[in-house]
Amino acid sequence: MTTLETLKWDGKKSGKVTLDLTVAKETSSADLIHRAVLRQLANKRQGTASTLTRSEVRGGGRKPYKQKGTGRARQGSIRTPLRPGGGIIFGPKPRSYNLDMNRKERRLALRTALMSRVSDMKAVEDFGSTLKQPKTSDIINGLARLGIQKNEKVLVILDSPSDVIKKSINNIEKVKLIAADQLNVFDILNANKLLIGQSAIDKIQEVYAS
């Protein structure tokens, strides 16, 4: 269990909130998180790369020149892998890169990753509450009030972000918005700072408790 200080949107302290999640043992946590990240990145790959072998590439039916008498190496086809425009040996073919990981392990890895970032985490009581219409500058100013530096990658975790907040954050290169029930290990570890809405903390503990 850990206790986070809660900040208001204007940057002032407003109280405290607790985050209590079960994590993996210290001896196995690194391996667990590594496998979770590897799986996530592998499953994003399209696997559509494809090349032609010598049997698939066009042409090559006739012998390019006679077997003997030219002084050159013998060739049986213009589509041999040894010639430009020839087939590819052991080139890529469409395949699936998907890796399996059972649900309990995935959730344990996510909880462990989240709790490992407690020192970089800030709880925000009313993130973007003053926004009436999409305005990127208001979000940038708000992040500065919360102690976020310009060059830091930030993951904003909210329970149910409004369209106004989504559109306001969308133009900021190093800020990513994610719903509390759609967390993933890579984004948690990739960010320099994590901003979590107070209601999102309740949602996280409800969804990922076990």
Curated annotation (Swiss-Prot):
Domain of life the protein comes from: Bacteria
Bias type Basic residues, positions: 60-71
InterPro entries in the cross-refs: Ribosomal_uL4, Ribosomal_uL4-like, Ribosomal_uL4_dom_sf
Example GO BP: translation
Keyword Ribosomal protein: yes
Chain residue ranges for the region called Disordered: 46-89
PANTHER family hit by this protein: 50S RIBOSOMAL PROTEIN L4, LARGE RIBOSOMAL SUBUNIT PROTEIN UL4C
Protein name, entry field: Large ribosomal subunit protein uL4
Species annotation: Prochlorococcus marinus (strain MIT 9215)
